[in-house]
Regions:
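Hydrophobic face of amphipathic alpha-helices that form TPR/SEL1-like repeat modules
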Residues: 1-26
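Proline-centered turn/helix-capping motifs that create local helix->coil transitions or kinks
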Residues: 12, 109-124, 306-310, 344-347, ...
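Conserved C-terminal structural/oligomerization subdomain of aldehyde/semialdehyde dehydrogenase
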Residues: 29-32, 218, 255, 309, ...
Length: 478
């Protein structure tokens, strides 16, 4: 398979550099070739998006929703093939990837239905004979910049509400999810989305990112990726007074109190930490355990981690597959080397047959660290987790909040009073009791505090707030 751009309703081959894509589960397998774009492709995509925007906005929300509904049906029909392609491209275990594609189906249907929801408000006027109300209007041309770790769900939870609100989209996916992105765009072509409403531009951020962010037709940006890049995007958008949304890093904590159901806590924490090889912004990367239950919990955790099944992504039994790329592998292994030098290794998963030729990283749990250590403070984005002790609930909350990030946090307890205190006191955008830090539902707002997110939210009704502006209308009828 070879990547292509989809601009103005036409499939075009970029003229930039090429990258051969190898299966991270088996580097001997060539999955396809990615052709990178030049800045001229961004210019073309921006022009196409601007040309299409007025006509798209003129359709009713219900009419725009029909396209999303049709795309959902095609996505569901393509689920097996698309999930396999994504697993081969970026290494997510096939069972997880199938679930992600199905989440994309649900997202499309959810936002399609929003096309007939009543939105806006009627506001009483101080003057007689005046009707005053608000309505939502499109922003215009929106840039959607997406990561490789959720190559289907994240693009769709941005693109679907953007389109429903009447915006046109320039979509730049991550390099390591480019082939999957092409297949997703083909589904929108198949439902006969009007030319220029969605434009796919494959490219490297350091080559075409500036051209995209500086394009004069751009009205908004939605980004998911690293904190450093996100903060840079926020600064550039602010200079143009342009609406932006940045979902960035996380160092998510799970607190285990002395009255917790240890078996439940271990199962949830292992899932939160090691599913997707820890390559989630919501992954559990810190565990804070009350001192009196520390030994019991860590022994159960050790046993669970040592039993994790590592296997190629297409193996239905794979709990943990490879990390996505050589860069990811090198970064994660550098933190594992740090752990071996400066921490105590509580648990480490075993190697598995058939994993010699891929980017496999054995899951690792480190202890013996203070709260300021890089393994406790830095986002690793891999199957590495640190465990620290807390004296009591108050100490656990202090440790939980001791981070530049504030995306997600969880607490395991049977104490309802402490559960509610945690929901109030944990400084994170998503707080969960007796659940893992990952797994927020699509109909709920998604986002964090501090350096994890901008001051907007994705998914649910909150996404419609971002992708639209409020216009206040008044008419005198006397």
């Amino acid at each position: 398979m070879e990547s292509r751009n989809w601009i103005g309703g036409e499939w075009l081959s970029p003229s930039g550099e090429e990258m051969v894509v190898h299966n991270p589960s088996d580097l001997k397998e060539e999955v396809g070739v990615v052709h990178f774009s030049e800045t001229s492709d961004i210019t073309q995509a921006g022009d196409a998006a601007q040309l299409a925007q007025a006509g798209w906005a003129a359709l009713s929300p219900a009419a725009r929703g029909v396209y999303l509904f049709k795309a959902a049906g095609l996505l569901e029909a393509a689920l097996p093939e698309l999930a396999e392609l994504a697993s081969r491209e970026m290494g997510k275990p096939i069972t997880e990837m199938r679930g992600e594609v199905m989440r994309g189906v649900h997202l499309l249907r959810y936002y399609a239905a929003e096309g007939v929801r009543s939105i806006g408000t009627v506001i009483p006027s101080n003057e007689p004979g005046v009707l005053q109300y608000t309505k939502r209007i499109p922003l215009g041309v929106t840039a959607v910049i997406t990561p490789w770790n959720f190559p289907v769900a994240i693009p769709l939870w941005k693109i679907a509400p953007a389109l429903l609100c009447g915006n046109t989209v320039i979509w730049k996916p991550a390099e390591h999810a480019s082939l999957t992105a092409v297949r997703v765009a083909e589904l929108f072509e198949a439902v006969q989305l009007p030319p220029g409403v969605l434009n796919l531009v494959i490219g490297q951020g350091n080559r075409i990112g500036d051209a995209l962010l500086e394009h004069p037709v751009l009205d908004a940006v939605s980004f998911t990726g690293s904190t450093a890049t996100g903060l840079g995007i926020a600064e550039r958008c602010a200079r143009r007074n342009m609406k932006y949304q940045t979902e960035m890093g996380g160092k998510n904590a799970a607190i285990v109190l002395k009255d917790a159901d240890v078996a439940q806590a271990v199962a949830m924490i292992v899932s939160g930490a090691f599913r997707s090889a820890g390559q989630k912004c919501t992954a559990t990367s810190r565990v804070i355990v009350e001192q009196s239950v520390y030994d019991t919990f860590t022994e159960a955790l050790r046993q669970a981690v040592e039993q994790i099944q590592i296997a190629p992504a297409l193996d239905p039994g794979a709990y943990l597959g490879p990390v996505a790329s050589a860069g990811q592998y090198e970064k994660v292994m550098s933190y594992i080397s740090l752990a071996r030098r400066e921490a105590e290794i509580l648990a480490e998963g075993g190697a598995a047959a058939g994993t010699e030729n891929g980017y496999y990283v054995r899951p690792l749990v480190a202890t013996g660290l203070n709260s300021s250590h890089p393994l406790i403070q830095k986002e690793i984005f891999g199957p590495v987790m640190g465990v620290v002790q807390a004296d009591d609930f108050e100490d656990a909350i202090r440790l939980c909040n001791d981070s530049i990030y504030g995306l997600s946090a969880s607490l395991f307890t049977r104490d309802l009073r402490l559960a509610h205190r945690f929901l109030d006191e944990a400084n994170a955008g998503m707080v969960r009791v007796n659940q893992e830090t990952a797994g927020v539902e699509y109909q709920a707002p998604f986002g964090g505090l501090k350096q994890s997110s901008s001051h907007t939210r994705e998914q649910g009704q909150a996404a419609l707030d971002f992708y639209s502006a409020i216009k206040t209308c008044a008419i005198s009828y006397e």
